[in-house]
Amino acid sequence: MTVSARTRKTVYARDNHECILARVSHRFNPCSGPLTLQHTVGRGMGGSKLFDTADLLVTMCNGHNTLATSDADFARYCTSRGLVRSRNSTRDPRLIPVLYWDGWYRLEGETRVPVHAGDAEEFMRLIGAIRDGLVA
């Protein structure tokens, strides 16, 4: 499935036309390649239009997008930041906050709704996305 041009434009604008990890210091590779969209919920074989909505997409450089699916440590790091979410979770993936460089947010289409850091981290621990202080 292909993300619509309108949704792509909305997500890029919401994320300031930069990789969501561009301003974050982390031990993984720096940004590389053109911008692309990262589905926060894996679509699996064949995909589904249900996951092609702005609240389930973030902007990533091609390098980080590739690492998110090919490097287990980086995938765990992304999970702890809400950038990768389990498709099999019993919780609505839209409720999972995302950690940007300037704080936690819940994504609502073209809007980032601020979430208190303590509340976001407690929620992430509850769903098993944060273990052993993985969020950096």
What do these predicted regions represent?
Residues 1-7, 40-47:
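Short Cys/His-rich Zn2+-coordinating modules
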Residues 2-36, 58-64:
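Short cysteine-rich loop/turn motifs with clustered Cys
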Residues 6, 73-77, 122:
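Exposed alpha-helical structural elements
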Residues 10, 14, 77, 81, ...:
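Residues that form generic nucleotide/phosphate-binding pockets
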Residues 27-40, 69-78:
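Short Cys/His-rich "knuckle" micro-motifs
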Residues 39, 61, 109:
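Pocket-edge structural micro-motifs
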Residues 44-55, 66-111:
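Polybasic, low-complexity binding patches
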Residues 101, 108-136:
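Charged phosphate-binding loop/patch that engages nucleotide di/tri-phosphates or the phosphate backbone
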